[in-house]
Curated annotation (Swiss-Prot):
GO CC annotation: membrane
Main localization of the protein described in the UniProt heading: membrane
Classification lineage: Eukaryota, Metazoa, Chordata, Craniata, Vertebrata
Bilayer topology: Single-pass type I membrane protein
Signal listed as a keyword: yes
Pfam family, any one: DUF4514
Keyword field: Membrane, Signal, Transmembrane, Transmembrane helix
InterPro entries: DUF4514
Spans traversing the lipid bilayer: 39-59
First and last residue of the signal peptide: 1-19
Protein name per Swiss-Prot or TrEMBL: Transmembrane protein 273
Record topology, Cytoplasmic segments: 60-105
């Protein structure tokens, strides 16, 4: 019983459940100012879009980084020379034989 009384005392001290009376006669409901709601939503969307753009750029940079695939660290105790991987040249799939003939002319 003592726990219940102390909980009620805490709730009353925090002003939970109290009736609010305004001098204007309006009900004290939660009024939402849509201007600030739209501003907050726009800021949240802008931050999210910026974060997504940053992550996409980081992933693209990591995928197309030529130096990261060619460089390897030397493990301890092994020789100092490690053969580097050679990359195959990229093919241009949009290039056709007809284009080659046009270029030769």
């Amino acid at each position: 019983m003592n726990l219940g009384v102390s909980m009620l005392r805490i709730l009353f001290l925090l002003d939970v459940g109290g009736a609010q009376v305004l001098a204007t006669g309006k009900t004290p409901g939660a009024e939402i100012d849509f201007k600030y709601a739209l501003i907050g939503t726009a800021v949240g969307v802008a931050i999210s879009a910026g974060f997504l753009a940053l992550k996409i750029c980081m992933i693209r940079r990591h995928l197309f980084d030529d130096d990261s695939s060619d460089l390897k660290s030397t493990p301890g105790g092994l020789s100092d020379t490690i053969p580097l991987k050679k990359r195959a040249p990229r093919r241009n799939h949009n290039f056709s034989k007809r284009d080659a003939q046009v270029i030769e002319l």
